[in-house]
């Protein structure tokens, strides 16, 4: 990223703090947030906290306005968090506000658009998630420890644009070779997605973003990566 490592970084819901601590060691100025003091326990993360050298702001609810001024950060990290929220709408809007012009968001979340997840949903009606679905045994206040809101990329694509951000790249996290045979369906996915995005081009609300959406939906990482690892940039203006 431009200016790295001389960046002001915010790691939202930092968990045990591995990312925040690594960026701090690289020379970034890093803050992190926790929703509850036991966040990292609820989400089944093991091992010691690594946030001793990082300022952690407690009790930060990502459903509410964030307590930071406009353009306060050059980089915001939202790693394996969005799927735990009832909706990503408020936090994406706030990220757009607190990012400086030219700043970046790095977001990762389970990729329900990958072909394996689509195949699983077609036959079972359930998304292929990394963690089990929230069960009846959970207290309502602990629901956020599970993947209660799998992220729909077309909606995320729109939310980012509304917040003043534009997707710059998608990267692979993990590709499972046992699912490689599903790539045989790529031509069918291409044709279906092209028809779907062209169908909306005559709609004034959708016309501006449909071609860009198609481009990202057909990226190899979108179709085969276990996680969606996305970098988006806030416009300079």
Question: Model features per residue range: what roles?
Answer:
Residues 8, 29-31, 166:
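Residues at the starts of beta-strands that form the adenosine-phosphate
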Residues 75-86:
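A short SAM/SAH-binding and catalytic strip from SAM-dependent methyltransferases
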Residues 16-64:
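Class I SAM-dependent methyltransferase SAM/SAH-binding core
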Residues 63-76:
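A short acidic, Gly/Pro-enriched loop at the edge of an enzyme's catalytic core
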Residues 1-4, 66:
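Glycine-rich helix-loop-beta junction characteristic of Rossmann-like nucleotide cofactor-binding loops
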Residues 18, 22, 35, 86-94, ...:
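S-adenosyl-L-methionine-dependent methyltransferase catalytic module, highlighting the catalytic core
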């Amino acid at each position: 990223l431009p200016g790295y490592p001389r960046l002001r970084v915010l790691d939202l819901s930092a968990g045990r703090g591995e990312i925040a601590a690594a960026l701090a060691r690289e020379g970034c100025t890093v803050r992190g947030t926790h929703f509850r003091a036991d966040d990292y326990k609820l989400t089944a993360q093991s091992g010691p906290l690594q946030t001793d050298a990082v300022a952690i702001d407690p009790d930060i609810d990502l459903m509410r306005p964030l307590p930071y001024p406009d353009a306060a950060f050059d980089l915001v990290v939202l790693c394996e968090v969005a799927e735990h929220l009832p909706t990503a709408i408020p936090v994406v809007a706030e990220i757009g506000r607190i990012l400086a012009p030219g700043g970046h968001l790095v977001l990762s979340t389970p990729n329900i658009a990958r072909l394996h997840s689509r195949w699983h949903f077609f036959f079972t009606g359930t998304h292929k998630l990394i963690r089990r679905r929230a069960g009846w045994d959970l207290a309502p206040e602990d629901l956020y420890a599970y993947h209660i809101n799998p992220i729909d990329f077309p909606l995320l694509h729109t939310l980012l644009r509304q917040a003043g951000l534009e997707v710059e790249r998608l990267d692979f996290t993990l590709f499972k070779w046992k699912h490689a045979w599903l790539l045989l369906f790529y031509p069918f996915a291409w044709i279906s997605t092209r028809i779907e995005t062209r169908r909306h081009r005559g709609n004034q609300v959708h016309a501006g973003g449909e071609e860009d959406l198609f481009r990202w939906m057909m990226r190899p990482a979108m179709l085969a990566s276990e996680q969606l690892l996305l970098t988006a940039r806030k416009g300079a203006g």
